[in-house]
Amino acid sequence: IWESSYVSILTKRLTNRGFLTGPMLPIYGSGAVVMLCATYPVQSSDVGIFLLGLIAATILEYVTGVVMETLFQVRYWDYSDKKFNIQGHICLSSSLAWGVFTLLLIRVVHPRISALLEKIPQNVCFSALVVITIVFAIDFASSFHAAMDLRQILESITNLKSDAEKLRERFIVLTDSVSETLRDKIGTIKKPESSRIEEFQTSVSECLEKLYSLVPKEKTADVIRLKERFAYLGELKNAISKRMDFRKIILLKGNPMLTSKKYADALNSLKEQIGLNKNK
């Protein structure tokens, strides 16, 4: 809840923060368990609780960040702009916060929750545990599938841009077969940008029509093939757009600070499509 509130304030929009569609954040649940286990031998020392909680939670955050980036090719958090960070996955300020949270968990939160649970009948607790576990498992499986599909979409958009650039280069070669005085009538095709694919397609269509009427007859077949390949890329683009369903949109909106080293341009394109980059 606190992170969703924090991000909502930063982005000035209501944000359901996290990897899952529901309100649960696995890293915090896992972090709490790790904190409890790691600090068990030093329960009498606040300094020991702070230090061991800091170290254990930082290790968990680093490992989780590396694994998620490897799987999904995106970062759900990035501390690269923070001082004393390691590969952007962890940083000093975050680690210090983990230490403070560990103290709060051990000294304030956990004792009260334990006392509350002791007052609730065991069969009620067990039933609640079963229901929550089932809901969590379904949400996790669905969210994992959406995240993997998002990675494939980002890869497809990147490949689409690369293919479009190759066809653009072929267009330039065909344009060279036209006399210099006629080239101005054809126009030029700008480099394809993932965030401006529609404009690129319009530019291509107009230029190819002009090129077809001006190239030597022996080159018209090449222009026709080029038009067909551009049309195919358009179909691929539409197919990619249809894969952006509700769950993937929720995933992006719930993580507006999502970054990707490998697919940065493609990710920015998707963010623009759903209105996340309007203020940039």
Task: Kindly label every feature range from the protein language model.
Residues 1-280:
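Aromatic-rich, lipid-facing transmembrane alpha helices and their immediate juxtamembrane interface loops
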